[in-house]
Amino acid sequence: MVDGFKGHKDSWELTGCTIMTDAWTDKRGRGVMNLVVHSAYGVCFLGSVDCSSERKDGKYIFELVDKCIDEVGERNVVQVVTDNAKVNEKASTLLKAKRPSIFWNGCAAHCIDLMLEDIGKLPLVDQTITKAKSLTVFLYAHTRLLDLMRKFIGKDLVRSGITRFATAYLNLKSLQENKKQLMRLFRSDELNEMGYLNMVKGKKASKVALSDSFWKGVDNAVNFFEPLAIVLRRMDSDVPAMGFLYGCLLEAKNEISAWFDHESSKFQQVFEIIDKRWDNKLKTPLHRAGYYLNPYYYYPNKLDIELDGTFRDGLITCITKMVDNVDLQDKIIQELEQYQDEDGTFAKEIAKRQWKNKNFDPGIA
């Protein structure tokens, strides 16, 4: 490593870091894997590997990651994060056998995107997305019609997201925001005089745009998607995420429930989808410890968190896994009591102001 990495290396040694992999295919069809390190100091690019001719099985991925850990320093690595592909599960098993102090977790953003995808496959949501797409395709298929649409709503209708179903959400949200203008457009003399509504696709688009059931479907789909899309945006940004992931998902479920007046029959399937992905990938000891050690959530929910027990258990698991010095383990537990009682440094007003800020980073504050 060259001197330009000094700031990164110092951060790795002080607060630990995460090794992340990103597999993709370039324009020439070559398989490429990027390897990066994320820490409180920022993101550091370690290298890119052309793996086109390699058998990308668990052993191969493990060996790539294992080499990176040697380069970064095993004591500095808290976790490895990859997507949720099956092949990575084998790699994680091999790593845990060799380096038991390091966690291997699936990418939270990928997991949440899979939740959105599963929700998008629910029959009523899928029908709404299909109708919405047919409506926007019709509006964008004719230059004169597109100009008229922009005149009525004052902007473009279609938006792009970071994933397919994030895009579906953004487009449904855009339709929802412009419902009145679109209904006015399809009832206008200007559109009628253009003749497009006499076409088969025009008649179908008009029927969709003026349908109460369609707009109800849009509202429901947006209410399912939006809370999770907000979590996805946070997980896929530079804003500190690990300490907020568990709490953000709880908030997303509460918001969905509130949208439907807490009538569980209206969102039960969506909750089952969320919980299945969440329970399988995002309720590890590290995620639970992050929630426990984030004062933004801990202090307002202290009683529930302590009574639950699984969050403290997750923290103890992390301590024993990451710290092999028993004296240091005991010191951490002693400091934990100060945290629980909001004593010492935690009692100071400056500390209280920080933890009440949702952009606060519990890892470096």
Indicate residue ranges for each PLM-predicted region.
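Short alpha-helical patches at protein termini and domain edges
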Residues: 1-365
